[in-house]
Amino acid sequence: VRYSSEHKAETRERVLKEAAKEIRAKGPDNVAVAGIMARAGLTHGGFYAHFKSKEALVGEAIGTMFADARARSAKIDAAGDPRAVLRAYVDFYLSPAHRDSRDRGCPLPTLSGDFARSEPATRERFGTGVVGIASRLAVPLAELGYADAAAESHALLAQLVGGVALARAVGDPALSDAMLADTHASIVARYGLEAAQ
């Protein structure tokens, strides 16, 4: 059966969405192509019609993860006032909902350690996503007058990612909540975001 190019593109997108979810949940080394294909409603045999290898799938799924993150934050980017934009990012990123949605949240706190050990091409792709997020954070920082908004965005992103990663990693729910709340309070105070909501 020959499928239209539109059908093939939709199928490929479905596989990428499932792969992105699975990689976030289990890490790139612990996912199985057969399982991803089954969750996408396809057979394992159809995989190679869409991807050359598991590594190629992982590389493209990274792009899907960052595109999902961009789509979720588009409303925040459009908020206008730079303090409100920054506060909205911080509120979302350091929320219990984001902490608890490992399979749908930002890939940085979940996968940074995994991709640090990946092939150079995969790390480069992940790095492109990191730069994209940092660049979006740099916009309100520049509007707030930070001379080196790029450097400031790197520091802010590292604190956000670290806060969520540690909150996810600890076994004590109270400590996890405290990690989020304390990181949030520190960032809000540092950037003067108390009144911005």
Predicted regions and their residues:
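Short, basic, alpha-helical segments at the C-terminal edge of helix-turn-helix-like DNA-binding modules
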Residues: 63-69
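Amphipathic alpha-helical segments used for helix-helix packing
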Residues: 85-88, 99-127
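Helix-turn-helix
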Residues: 14, 21-56, 60
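Hydrophobic alpha-helical connector segments
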Residues: 60, 74-105, 153-156
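Hydrophobic/aromatic-rich alpha-helical bundle segments in the mid-to-C-terminal region
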Residues: 120-128, 141-197
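Alpha-helical structural signal
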Residues: 12, 16, 33, 44, ...
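Solvent-exposed, amphipathic alpha-helical segments
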Residues: 14, 18-25, 72-75, 159-166
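N-terminal intrinsically disordered/low-complexity leader segments
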Residues: 1-10, 194-197
